[in-house]
From Swiss-Prot:
This is Protein TusC. HAMAP family: Thiourid_synth_C (MF_00389). InterPro entries: DsrEFH-like, Sulphur_relay_DsrE/F-like, Sulphur_relay_TusC, Sulphur_relay_TusC/DsrF. Heterohexamer, formed by a dimer of trimers. The hexameric TusBCD complex contains 2 copies each of TusB, TusC and TusD. The TusBCD complex interacts with TusE. Keywords: Cytoplasm, tRNA processing. Part of a sulfur-relay system required for 2-thiolation of 5-methylaminomethyl-2-thiouridine (mnm(5)s(2)U) at tRNA wobble positions. The keyword Cytoplasm applies. Belongs to the DsrF/TusC family. It comes from Enterobacter sp. (strain 638). GO terms for biological process: tRNA processing.
Length: 119
């Protein structure tokens, strides 16, 4: 079975990339159980708590990330350098229980996946 990685690199609500990535992630979960989810660059904003998308008249799809463990998707990683570059503390509460890793460690984890989809 192919190992599939989803890499979120774009901020939420500025484009549909994050929402489309989440939809693809949920659909893929029906086909394989070996899924890894990575948050890099502006993608780290996808899983920050306390967002209020309704204030900009956007749909709140961020809360859907919370249900991923119900679909047996429970491998999440966040780039430590991306958090630091954006002034976000590594210990800030996230929507998901994600492990914070260095860029080198993320690259190593990502190298074990057969398919990489970027959103």
């Amino acid at each position: 079975m192919n190992r599939v990685a989803f890499v979120f690199t774009s901020a939420p609500h500025g484009s549909s990339a994050g929402r489309e990535g989440l939809d693809a992630l949920l659909a893929t979960s029906a086909l394989t159980e070996d899924i890894g989810v990575f948050f890099v660059g502006d993608g780290v904003f996808q899983i920050l708590t306390g967002q209020q998308p309704q204030r900009i008249l956007a749909r709140d799809y961020i809360s859907t990330f919370k249900v991923l463990p119900l679909y047996d998707i429970d491998t999440f990683w966040v780039c430590a350098a991306s958090l630091k570059e954006r002034g976000i503390d590594e210990n800030i509460p996230l929507v998901l229980d994600a492990e914070v890793l260095s860029p080198a460690a993320l690259r190593e984890k990502l190298s074990h996946y057969h398919v990489v989809l970027t959103f």
